[in-house]
Amino acid sequence: MGQIFIKYSNDITDKLQEILPTDLKNLKINQSKYSFLMKENGGIYDDLIITRMKDKYMIILNAACKQNDLQIIKNKLNDQNLDMNNDLSLIAIQGPESKTILENVVSNVSKLKFMNGENFSFKNNEIFITRSGYTGEDGFEISLPNKVAISFVEELISKGSTLIGLGARDTLRLEAGLCLYGHDINENTSPVEANLKWAISINRINDNFIGSHQIKKQIEEGVSKLRVGIKPETRVIARESTKIFDERKRGNI
């Protein structure tokens, strides 16, 4: 994942709101929001998590898109010196036991509310933990220095955590209806078509941001395609891009 930190100011907030359909002005300190980097046609360059920290914004980007995302943000902020922090790792611990396990490694972490974060300490290193994740389960994401990432994971394992792969993550996020960029959403899919209108702040729908004209039009007039969940009746796997029919073609997996 890519991690970008941008010094907070009212001007920066205004500029970020031109490319994100999120109300950043009412974002509380240490609160996170799911958002999108918007395209002129209403499509999505990438989905992301933005957190308002005390004196800066933290933006978590998808690894496959991070360089393109970074350039878009640089251009909007007119700051070509803005860069990714490559000295940090991002670790996720998810599931119903995540709170108990993580509490045995970092004290008081269980007090965090969903989509909120705080600074903590691990082996005399400052780390930032948010109560978030992409599995539909309770969980936490930890931003920490690379030099302590392995020892942090080893601590989690010693307290009862188990390593999982992307297959397990993918199953969980599908069951929770969470999108994966490049599969369920892309540059030609709008938040409305992706059934992600909830992620557009209500007070921004009639506001100006990149792609806002198309978004408003789709909300008012409806869309010809819409992401929905389906449940197969048999054990046959519904693979990505499989065509869906009844008396005629209805869509794709």
Region spans (language model):
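Acidic, proline/glycine-enriched N-terminal capping motif
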Residues: M1-M38, G43, G167
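Short, surface-exposed charged micro-motifs
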Residues: D47-I49
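Conserved, structured C-terminal
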Residues: R52-I253
